[in-house]
Amino acid sequence: WVYDPATSHVSRKTILKKPVFWGIWIAFYINITCGLALISQEKDILHDVLRAFPQYANLSPAKFAAAISGIIGLVLAVDSVFNTAGRVGFSTLSDHLKRRETVYQVIFIMSIAVCLLQIFTNSIGNALLWAVLAMLFLVNAGYGGGFSTLPVLLDQHFGTKTVSTTHGLTLSAWAFAGLSGNQLASFVVAHAPDQAHRYAALIPVLTGLFVVALISISLVKYLGDRN
């Protein structure tokens, strides 16, 4: 195979005019935004949950911070494992599926489910560590998986010759998510009506965003099936 600039050229304007591109862009942007929003508050969420444990109730702030530092460090390390596993696992799953959008649907449904679990159990307020960890680990897995499966999704809709261009354009969503994810979380936490449960207020917002992402990627799949 020899690279031919004439036949391999793709117009960026043409790509940007396609609804399918924007459906993918929105879904990718939301997945990264939610992942960054949760990661940015992860230590504080764990801090609040662990503070409710009886063995830590009477400790001074300094002793409490020292006592839980190892636990938080371990959780962050396991987070990285789930992020890596999500990248490998979801990309492997996508190789066995006819429609690549299905992987994103699985990621978003999984993320919605674990967020709803927090809402219905009030896991942060009730110090249900297992439920909080399930949310942190699975959302992190989806965060990594959404990134690793993006190229094959773009290949499916725009062709192999355009992957570099479409991938570059879609990665602009990562840049915007980097600007908005942490700020979104900080805004929601700072303006929560009940400051005693300020971190729990973030979860319904993430749930709503994941629903929008699921709708967006489902529309992409619908348009792809029509074509």
Predicted regions and their residues:
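Extracytoplasmic gate region of multi-pass secondary transporters
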Residues: 13-91, 151, 178-185
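A late C-terminal transmembrane helix in Major Facilitator Superfamily
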Residues: 143, 157-193
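C-terminal transmembrane helical hairpin of 12-TM major facilitator-type secondary transporters
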Residues: 34, 70-83, 88-153
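Juxtamembrane helix-start elements in MFS-like secondary transporters
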Residues: 55-76, 100, 128, 132, ...
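A membrane-interface helix-boundary motif in multi-pass transporters
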Residues: 187-209
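Membrane-interface helix caps of multi-pass small-molecule transporters
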Residues: 88, 92, 96-97, 183, ...
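Small/hydrophobic positions within alpha-helical transmembrane segments
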Residues: 30, 78, 82, 110, ...
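Multi-pass alpha-helical transporter architecture, strongest
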Residues: 175, 207-227
